[in-house]
Amino acid sequence: MDMLWDVLIIGAGPAGGLAALDCAKQGLRVMLVEQRSFPRWKVCGCCFNNQAQAILSSRGNATLIEDCGGQRLDSLRLGLRGREASLALPNGFVLSREQFDQALINSAIKAGASARFQMTAQVEEASPNYRRVRLKDHQSGITSHVNARIVLVAAGLSQRCLPQNEAGQSKIRRQSRHGAGCVVDDDTDHYPSGAIHMAIGNQGYVGLVRREDGLLNLAGAFDRD
């Protein structure tokens, strides 16, 4: 008989990791499934304000960011058409997504959740008391099935795990901008730590921040033309 889980969560980013932590702390039997291997790099989402820290604190992880080496952020530096302004960012922190996401998952595992990586999940038919999910291991190619009373999909906009008739339809506006990001090895002091640096223009913007390991996270959004 297939194993029955209380909650199966697809996607191990911050939403999935936090959901797994919450559910595991409630004593539920939790499986967290992620198609990539972790830790993995990701640019956006490495800056944390008071609200983000309050959420972590409410889950018993008040020092998670600092324990992982997170660096304080105290200012936002803006540049537009040759002019510059600096705004205060009280109690901000920066921590790479490699460190943060993995730490959140580790907390969920410590609370009792089970995590599986490099595994694709496909939600199948629903029964009165559970939902069936097909899992495929990327390394072995082996396919298996599990059942869960609740399935949470936290796989982002690019998810392909729901049946077509349940997935909804994403609409991309013609005027929407393209996003791009990378991690840069930079040993100059032009972009000091402790600040978010942003350049703004009519056709888009670029922002960067120095991480706890000295690398720069750089991301931008640009008009299509």
Regions found by a protein language model. Give the residues of each.
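Conserved Rossmann-like nucleotide-cofactor binding loop
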Residues: 15, 38, 158
